[in-house]
């Protein structure tokens, strides 16, 4: 089992959610986050003064998936989140040692 974490542009969330849902991913966790990478933020004009915005709004998506789905999930996220411009985001894949469904006590892949 793997935990796939993707940091994407907020306006791409619906497309990514639909792509994951259509391939059978049962659930995701979404968190609003801020960060920066190579784009290093940007300058905004507010009431005649320039301000540097260091952290850009992003969305973090987390999905626990069976090993057999990992490559397909990565491809789905890449395809749905890509704009071809800087700041499209990153995908991280972590090993999951254990998953427990609290309500039923199911463990492992059955708990996904």
Q: Positions of the model-derived regions?
A:
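Positively charged, small/polar-rich N-terminal and surface patches that mediate targeting and assembly
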Residues: 1-112
